Amino acid sequence: MDQDACTHSAALILAAGKGTRMCSNKPKVLHTLLGEPLLFHVISALRPLFGSNIWVVIGHGSSLIQSICSDLSLNFIYQEKQLGTANAVSIALPVLQQSRIKRLMVINGDMPLITSDLLECIIKKSDKTDFVFATLKLPLPNDYGRILRREGKIYSIIEAKDIEPSLQHDTTVEVNAGLYYFSLEVVDKCLPMIKNENKSQEYYFTDIIELAVENGYLVDSIYFEEDWHFLGVNTPKDLSYVESIQQAFIIEKLLQSGVIIHSPESVRISPFATIEPGVEIYGPCEIYGASYIASGSIIYSHSWIKNTTISHDVCIYSFCHLDTVIIKDKCSIGPYARLRPGCHLEEQVCIGNFVEIKKTQLGKHVKINHLSYIGDAIVGDESNIGAGTITCNYDGENKHHTFIGKKAFIGSNTALVAPLTIGEKSLIGAGSVIIRDVPENMVSIARGKQKNFSKRK
């Protein structure tokens, strides 16, 4: 889409519904698919085509939706009463007109398998029409609205609840996919004519098709053979099914690109993750968010990774939990390690079993091999942190920082009470509780004097 078209076109996501059949108080569009809300998947498909011209109609759980989407540069429109899809569009219309939008795409917020390429096909189809929408042919139409044609031309859509009994058992019929792109002029004229004279007593946006045809507008459709792109989520079963389709597609694409995946049926990978050819993954494993894994790295089973950048030749052993971390080349993590948000590991860092790290920078060749907690710290190159080392970073009110210089050696079972600085090449004796700064090249021991007593006979 060219810049001018992008400026005067917009997308409207319908996300105000309660999603009653999900049996949850959470807004339906916030239920997650492969670690991300359904709404995020739709936004991801729209963003390359519409930029910041994306409006979301919200109602149930509106404050929660706005909070979770606060960093996404979206425009929100509140629908107080959910009176139907036409009502949602009518509420948005004045805002869109004020923003000088000329063409609008309307899409449901629960269609996570939609793609930018597919949306672009619909936009291109609209060049010679006033209103275009997507259709499918399904052997079991279920809840989909039926397309009615007269002499081959579309003239109406009938929603599933209002279909005559004689048509209920039709085999393989053309249905509405729930995706529209049109001139705002059509909506401005025809939307006020829509009535709620149907079994649901709702204002159906699909009624605009018949009204547009009657008023002389050019209405057309684009048929898609692959119906799975348009699958919506209405129930927990739907969510599970859609997720399985998305996962199978992602796994197949990665396998073809050269990623080695053992037990692929037990591996879950976000569509927003990037994994280079030459990576090896053992299932079960979960990789979410905008994670990036470079070639040569190995991810062993039962690892959970989110929004993490893993460079070349890194080994993540089993049962590791990595959240928003940067890991440079040739590091070794785990097993049973937890790296929390804000960690940055330079090249060839070794993190062993039962180690937790939070908001910490580790220099090159740092070793933390066993049973330690390092939080709010900076550790210099080639330092060694002994087993059982704890940075005592919280005083009950505030967090404090620990600075450990290059080539320092921290003995086992040491408590470092922050704020604290350990100088370069210093050595801390095992079992110490360090409460004051230690200068460079010093040995510091802070523990009780050992006393031996004879055993009683």
UniProtKB/Swiss-Prot annotation:
Acetyl-CoA binds at A387, N393, Y394, S412, A430, R447. Pathway: Nucleotide-sugar biosynthesis; UDP-N-acetyl-alpha-D-glucosamine biosynthesis; N-acetyl-alpha-D-glucosamine 1-phosphate from alpha-D-glucosamine 6-phosphate (route II): step 2/2; Nucleotide-sugar biosynthesis; UDP-N-acetyl-alpha-D-glucosamine biosynthesis; UDP-N-acetyl-alpha-D-glucosamine from N-acetyl-alpha-D-glucosamine 1-phosphate: step 1/1; Bacterial outer membrane biogenesis; LPS lipid A biosynthesis. Its main location: cytoplasm. It catalyses: alpha-D-glucosamine 1-phosphate + acetyl-CoA = N-acetyl-alpha-D-glucosamine 1-phosphate + CoA + H(+); N-acetyl-alpha-D-glucosamine 1-phosphate + UTP + H(+) = UDP-N-acetyl-alpha-D-glucosamine + diphosphate. Binds 1 Mg(2+) ion per subunit. It comes from the Bacteria. Residues 258-457 are annotated as: N-acetyltransferase. It is found in: Cytoplasm. Its EC number is 2.7.7.23, 2.3.1.157. Residues 1-236 are annotated as: Pyrophosphorylase. It holds the Pfam family NTP_transf_3. GO terms for cellular component: cytoplasm; membrane. GO terms for biological process: cell morphogenesis; cell wall organization; lipid A biosynthetic process; peptidoglycan biosynthetic process; regulation of cell shape; UDP-N-acetylglucosamine biosynthetic process. GO terms for molecular function: glucosamine-1-phosphate N-acetyltransferase activity; magnesium ion binding; UDP-N-acetylglucosamine diphosphorylase activity. Its cofactor is Mg(2+). Keywords: Acyltransferase, Cell shape, Cell wall biogenesis/degradation, Cytoplasm, Magnesium, Metal-binding, Multifunctional enzyme, Nucleotidyltransferase, Peptidoglycan synthesis, Repeat, Transferase. Residues 237-257 are annotated as: Linker. The active site is at H370 (proton acceptor). HAMAP family: GlmU (MF_01631). Catalyzes the last two sequential reactions in the de novo biosynthetic pathway for UDP-N-acetylglucosamine (UDP-GlcNAc). The C-terminal domain catalyzes the transfer of acetyl group from acetyl coenzyme A to glucosamine-1-phosphate (GlcN-1-P) to produce N-acetylglucosamine-1-phosphate (GlcNAc-1-P), which is converted into UDP-GlcNAc by the transfer of uridine 5-monophosphate (from uridine 5-triphosphate), a reaction catalyzed by the N-terminal domain. Homotrimer. In the N-terminal section; belongs to the N-acetylglucosamine-1-phosphate uridyltransferase family. In the C-terminal section; belongs to the transferase hexapeptide repeat family. PANTHER family: BIFUNCTIONAL PROTEIN GLMU (PTHR43584:SF3), NUCLEOTIDYL TRANSFERASE (PTHR43584). This is Bifunctional protein GlmU. It comes from Lawsonia intracellularis (strain PHE/MN1-00).
